[in-house]
Amino acid sequence: AINQALKIEAPKFDKKKFEKAVDYALTLTTQHGDFYPLIRKAFEDAGVIFVILPNLPGSGINGATKKIGQNVMLMVNDRRFYSDTVWFTLFHEIGHIINGDYGITFENEHAGQEDAADKYAEDKLIPPGEYEAFVRMNEFSENAIRRFAERIDRDPGIVLGRLQNDQIVPFTNVALSKALKHKYKVITS
């Protein structure tokens, strides 16, 4: 990832521009085909070099951030590249950048910085007040999840992934996962 990032010319990292690029990225969660080049360009304009790499089996690595000169590298891999995991991993790594901490994120790692990045991703992807109101309704059918996702302008797989992570909907509900989680295939060249 670092080698790829070093090949890319980008302006100096600008946190305010990056925050605007992050808000733009949120608008792309329902665009399954072309989001990567759009986000990559918006981030690059803010000094963040966004790289997607193939998974290294057995590594347990989901993503990483690193300061490289005057830029920041943001890497995610294509492991479990479904709508819920790709967007959560991306926004988790964005959380590290916004919080000013950099490094590698391993699966099932929980510490202060990791928890803060998780919270950032959760709150950016699904507004907390709206999520709490949706959960209180206690209706988690495919249609209910789709309606809520449409209302907050997010991919329904993101909502389902959050419900599963919060142990509200079981991961064993394969039919719901197949119906709502989009599988991405990103061409990175």
Please name every model-derived segment.
Residues A1-S189:
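Active-site hotspot residues in diverse enzymes, especially metal/ion-binding acidic/histidine motifs
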